[in-house]
Amino acid sequence: MKAMILAAGKGTRVRPLTHAMPKPMIPVLGKPVMEYLVEHLARHGFDQIMVNVSHLAPAIEGYFGDGRRWGVQIGYSFEGHLEGGETIASPVGSAGGIKRIQEFGGFFDDTFLVVCGDAVIDLDLSAVLRKHWQSGAAASIVVREVPRDRVPNYGVVVCDSSGRIQSFQEKPSVDEARSQLVNTGIYIFEPSIIDLIPKDQDFDIGSELFPLILKKGLAFNAIESPFNWIDIGQLSDYWEANQQMMRGRLRGVEMPGIEVRPKIWTGLNVKIDWDEVRVEGPVYIGSASCIEPGVQIYGPTWIGTGCYLESGARISRSIVFDYSRVGPTGSVSDALVFGRNCVDQNGESIPDLGGALDWVADSRELMPPAK
C-alpha cells in the first residue's frame, strides 16, 4: 500500500530547534519523530512511501535513505531549486505536494494515506482503511475528540450523525466551536481527489482542498477512532510529547538503553557515581555523558549523548540535547537545552542573572581535560 508523509514545512512554531534540523528530524526519546511514523506505516503494510521535502531536505534524505532499514521503499519529492550552488526551499503546500508527485510519475494509483511528519501515533491504520472503504467516501479524515478548552488549538471538523463532514472551523474560540472533533492530520484519499488540485500552484489540504471537496458534494467522511496522538505543533507540544512518552503513555514505544535502576535508563559508558547524585525517574542519560557529584535530576528528563552536568546543576522535567553542558549554577526546569540555548516551552530564552547564559555551552568545547 502507498502513503505520503508531509515533511516540507519550515517548522516555524518549533523554532529555534528547526534552525538546525527539519521538524520531522526533531528527536523524541533519541529518535527522529518521523521514524516512529515510518515504523508504524510499515507495521500496517504501507511499504511504498513518498516524502515531500524542502527545508533542510538533505537531513531527512540522508537519514532515511531508500527505506530498506525499515522494510519499506521511500522516495522523495524535493520542493525547491538550486541557485548559485545553494539549495533554495520552495514548498508548494500540502495538497500541491501531492499533485507534484502525481504529475511526475502517477504514483497514487489506488487508495492512499497522507500523514503529517510531525506526530507520533498508535492508530490502527488497517481498521481506519476498512472504515473508509465501507463508507464509499472519496476522502476521509481521522478525527479525535479533545477537551473543549483545547479546541482553539486545532482545526475543528463538523459532521452529521453518520460521520459525513459538513463544515470546518479553523481554531475557533471555545464559545464558537461547533464540535470537539479535531483534524489529526491523517487523511485517506482516493486518486480521483487529486484532479481537484490545480497544477503548479501552492495549494493547502486543510484550507483549500477540503472546502473544494465539500463544494463539489463528494462523499467526505470523518473517522473517529480511539488512539494516542502526540502532535508536535509547537515547542510546548514537543516538551509534552517527551514527558508523555517517558511516562510510557504510548503503546509500543520503549525507552532506549539499559534500565540500571527503577525508571532510570542509561546509554553506554556513562560516568556517574550513583551515591553522590540525586536522580528520580523517569530519566534517561545518554552514552558518554558525565554527571558530576552533587547533580540533581528529576524526571521525566532526557539527557542526550555526550552531555556534561557539573556539580551543583539541577535539571527537572527537561530535555537536554546531545553534547550540552550545564554549569554549576544551572537550574533548568520545564525547559529545553541545546548548544548555548536554554528555552522554555514557548521558545522564550530563560534569563540569566548575569545577562549571558554562561552556564550553558557545548560540552565538547568546555569538557575538562582527561586526567
Predicted regions span which residues?
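N-terminal glycine-rich phosphate-binding loop and ensuing alpha1 helix
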Residues: 1-62, 72
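A structural motif detector for beta-strand N-caps
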Residues: 258, 264, 269-277, 283, ...
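Conserved beta-loop-beta/alpha segment of the NTase-like Rossmann-fold superfamily
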Residues: 61, 69-161, 196
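Short internal beta-strands
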Residues: 50-54, 142-143, 336
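Long terminal segments
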Residues: 341-371
